[in-house]
Amino acid sequence: MVRVSGSGKELKRICWLIVAGLLSACTPAPEFTDAAGQTVTLDHFAGKPLLVNYFAPWCAPCLREMPHLNALATEGEIAVVAINYDPTTPAELDKLAAQYHIKVPLLIANEDARLPFPRPSGLPTSYLLDSEGKLKQTLVGELGQSQIDALKASIRHPGN
């Protein structure tokens, strides 16, 4: 018999932490549905920072910030997706994009998706993920140009 220092409870806790870490590493990426009805995961946007924006067509601040999000996505430094907060269909996403001139990919979150961020309690809410998919910032409220500029600076100079 080999004696190991530390209590049995402590070793058991360490083993459970290891198992939990392994299980979370094996959790599939959350799935979304795009306007074409295709399945999309956040892994599709890996390799560059990603701004995930929750919006709704009835939310005036959400619609006011869309031109800023369109411009940010066009610049290409940060990928941008917008998730409709309300249940909807791919056809309705297409209508929204046309009606409000939304150029960023519009997605529907599957209800059972395990997201790397909480479902927002208010709109608009945006989540900035780094190039590895880790949550870096949560931004609640309408994004104006000054917030967009700060986001870009935080990506260029992490830790500042």
Which residues does each PLM region occupy?
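Thiol-based oxidoreductase modules, predominantly thioredoxin-like and allied folds used
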Residues: 78-90, 102-111
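Sec-dependent bacterial lipoprotein signal peptides
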Residues: 1-26
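Short, internal strand/loop/helix patches
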Residues: 98-131
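Short alpha-helical
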Residues: 60, 87-91, 143-146
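Conserved helix-turn-beta segment immediately C-terminal to the redox Cys motif
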Residues: 48-50, 64-86, 98-99, 150, ...
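Thiol-/selenol-based redox modules, centered on thioredoxin-like
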Residues: 125-160
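N-terminal "domain-start" segment that seeds a small globular fold
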Residues: 21-43
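Short active-site neighborhood of thiol/selenol oxidoreductases, capturing the structured segment around
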Residues: 42-63
